[in-house]
Amino acid sequence: MIQDVLLHGSSKSNKKWDRDTIIPFMLLPLLLVVATVSLTITMIVMTFIGMGALYVMSRPRQKNRSPFFYSWTLSSGICMFLVYELGVLSMLQITQLENFVFLVLLAGTCYCFYKMKAIADYELYLGTKGKEYSPVLTSDSYYCQICQLEVNERFFHSIWWDCCVFRPNYIYFLCGQVFAFATLLLGTNLGLTTICHPVILYGSVMIPQDCNDVYFEFNYALCFVSCVYGIGYLLIIALVLLRQLFIYLPKYIGNITHIYGAYNL
């Protein structure tokens, strides 16, 4: 009887995780398509997404144990990339050099976040950085309520990447954020200067000036909405980088200095 109850509970939990994994890949494209109706609807949809993100960040940590947020990150990247490749590039206004630089930055972003996840998965579950909860925590360990593991040298848990960030993978997290910022900055600028009326800022660098006509054609509207969504991501990443600069980067440098100092002794 007890085994049947446990199996039933496990089945319900697995179904919930499957649903949480799939929903972002359906919900985000739907929201982006709805946002193409008009500028007012675009602002409403983007505000809705932003308020949803703020709500998630304000919830107790143990309630964020879901693959939904990681799937949202993946679906965001995939949607914006597909719009860029199938929408923006099809207008044939972006040079090969600009596209090459964009792809290099994107590859750097993917590599850094892949390494961050791979190191976290190995160190926490197969290596020495994670272990089952102990009532007595050591000075360099912290119990993660989401991973449900005691994590050594932990900085924080990223629900958007579904892993703990600690000393071995922190540099990949930081570099991934820098690459992601550069990728989105270039991608949104290329997209907006392609679909809007651009103006020369300096040399060959252009910025969008007039985007009033984008809602008259679906392809243009979808590209514009995706760029607005990308700008929202840019602002979030900028805040993340500022937080790293003032809080976690000094801590990381201090840890590295301490380790190398002890090693030299």
Question: What are these model-predicted stretches?
Answer:
Residues 131-139, 148-152:
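Short, flexible, mixed-charge glycine/proline-rich loop motifs
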Residues 153-156, 167-170:
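Short, non-ligating residues that shape and space the ligands of small metal-coordination modules
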Residues 140-143, 160, 207:
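Secretory pathway export signals and precursors
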